[in-house]
Amino acid sequence: MTAPIVTTFDITRPNDDAENLHFTLNVKNNTSKMLELRFPDGQTHDFVVKDFAGKEIWRWSKGRMFTSAMRSETLKGKEDTIYEESWSSKGQHGSFTAVAILRSNNFPVETTVQFVLP
């Protein structure tokens, strides 16, 4: 059986930018039918960075306000949606784990990528 939702999580460093990392979570409807992603509030996604010991050092949503109303997004068959955010890694060195979270009630996703900052 094919999974209805397929995700990819990428971390890139924009050209000529030594301090910022760009996080991209691509969420694809892997079916030919329309899918509705349901969210408990206005926050659809989140990105987290943890250090080597697993301590959280950055969370995109920290300090942000989101509506309390439930919301939904519809994806047509084979359609995708992209969630993107950036993090300033200034002064950070070592091994890290980034976590991308799709906060959908009906298709929740949490995926990780490990990376090193010299």
Task: Please provide the spans of the model-predicted regions.
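Extracytoplasmic/periplasm-facing segments of secreted or lipoprotein envelope proteins
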Residues: I11-R13
